[in-house]
Amino acid sequence: MLTDDGKHLYVSWDEYHMLIERLALKIAGSGWEFDQILCLARGGMRPGDVLSRVFDKPLAIMSTSSYRAEAGTIQGRLDLAKYITMPKGELAGRILLVDDLSDSGVTLRAVVDRLRGMPSISELRSAVIWTKGVSSYTPDYFVEKLPTSPWIHQPFEEYDDLRPEGLAKKFVI
């Protein structure tokens, strides 16, 4: 639900899963066949996992990080992992790159540029749940285009500030 001032978008677990399923249908509807999925950790891990299961494709993971200040709302320096993690083999063929959103577009553009330099990748497309109007990168597949740039409150963010002590309090009788 988008707030009246357009600055915040709150997403429930049910909405989140429905959006990932809609993303899967968009990808399937395109008719594009791909060999592997590369998800960006952390935001792309949940969508990547679901898409890996739905399409029955191997899942690789690349860690990225850019949100640093102001409770994670101010983008800082972009860090890309040196290595891509996958169970076997190498990242090769037709790759679907998955993240949760294209915010500024900086992360996706940097990863795409890096992947295009890998000779083992023959084709690359990208998929996200949300893309913002301010993004400098437009993914091949997305579910919602947000004309403004709201902060998206995803359902798993409740764990960002939850520590074991707080979790234990939930189960005290």
Predicted feature residues:
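PRPP-associated nucleotide enzymes
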Residues: 1-173
